[in-house]
Amino acid sequence: MEAVVFVFSLLDCCALIFLSVYFIITLSDLECDYINARSCCSKLNKWVIPELIGHTIVTVLLLMSLHWFIFLLNLPVATWNIYRYIMVPSGNMGVFDPTEIHNRGQLKSHMKEAMIKLGFHLLCFFMYLYSMILALIND
């Protein structure tokens, strides 16, 4: 059972790494004016909920399988994703809003957040890989 948890977590982490890279590429395209703000935000907003669900499922799965350290490591990022989604002001297009993305350095903060998430998911990838190998050896 433990190996199944880490195999699923590893696959989910791969998807989240892909999403983080996609966010970085799309935001850098906006920064370089290759795409406009509206198309950038619509592309990114449709992936916010899948990212939220994917990360939350892994976090809950780790809680249910009693892997406390990895759960506590994932909890702040999952909480941040939920908070960010819930706190979208009414009238905005989503987490990424084309009218506000160039204001107050939001583009830079979104880019920094995507980079931090990429680093976090890469760290988690290797932790899940190590834990999966350890679980398979112990079975």
From Swiss-Prot:
Taxonomic superkingdom: Eukaryota
SMART domains for the chain: Cornichon
Membrane topology reported for the UniProt record: Multi-pass membrane protein
Record-linked InterPro entries: Cornichon
Cell location: Membrane; Endoplasmic reticulum; Endoplasmic reticulum-Golgi intermediate compartment
Transmembrane regions: 5-25, 57-77, 118-138
GO molecular function: CCR5 chemokine receptor binding; signaling receptor binding
GO cellular component assignments: COPII-coated ER to Golgi transport vesicle; endoplasmic reticulum; endoplasmic reticulum membrane; endoplasmic reticulum-Golgi intermediate compartment
GO BP annotations, alphabetical order: endoplasmic reticulum to Golgi vesicle-mediated transport; protein transport
Pfam families on file: Cornichon (PF03311)
Primary localization: membrane
Keywords linked to the UniProt accession: Endoplasmic reticulum, ER-Golgi transport, Membrane, Protein transport, Transmembrane, Transmembrane helix, Transport
Family, per entry: Belongs to the cornichon family.
Subunit and partners: Interacts with Sec23/24 complex components SEC24B and SEC24D. Interacts with CCR5. Interacts with ADRB2 in the early secretory pathway.
Role this protein plays: Involved in G protein-coupled receptors (GPCRs) trafficking from the endoplasmic reticulum to the cell surface; it promotes the exit of GPCRs from the early secretory pathway, likely through interaction with the COPII machinery.
The protein's name in its UniProt record: Protein cornichon homolog 4
Classification of source organism: Eukaryota, Metazoa, Chordata, Craniata, Vertebrata
The gene coding this protein: CNIH4
